């Protein structure tokens, strides 16, 4: 219980020392924000929360070329479920110059996703379970975030 800090390089994942469950929080901190990375490539930067079985409990994809943030879930080897979209990516990062903070609050039946202190979505969970690992991925070195993001979990708060 308490606070755990993880450094996640692009293309890698980390196992959590304590699972994230209802009432807990995950925050991803990036020391850089590159909203010009999308020219000519799909620029799909993703942050993911995984269950023990490898299910994507929450998949957050920042797609600059399409100018959307996609939220979705899927079971291992299963299809993606019903995606939810928030448009105007750059506008969602207003407020903190040159840096990014993406916070996920686990409310039990939904995830509240806050970007730079502004709620962008209340995502109704399509798959339930404890978050036991996190990942950070980016297409071809064109992440909108820094090469390493810091993830902080706040657990046992409830």
UniProtKB/Swiss-Prot annotation:
Its EC number is 3.1.21.-. Transmembrane segments: none annotated. InterPro entries: ConA-like_dom_sf, Galectin_CRD. It comes from the Eukaryota. The modification Blocked amino end (Gln) is found at residue 1. Residues 12-155 form the Galectin domain. Anti-tumor lectin with DNase activity. Inhibits the growth of several tumor cell lines in vitro. Induces lymphocyte infiltration and necrosis of tumor cells in a mouse tumor model. Induces apoptosis in HeLa cells. Binds N-acetylneuraminyl lactose (N-acetyl-alpha-neuraminyl-(2->3)-beta-D-galactosyl-(1->4)-beta-D-glucose). This is Anti-tumor lectin.
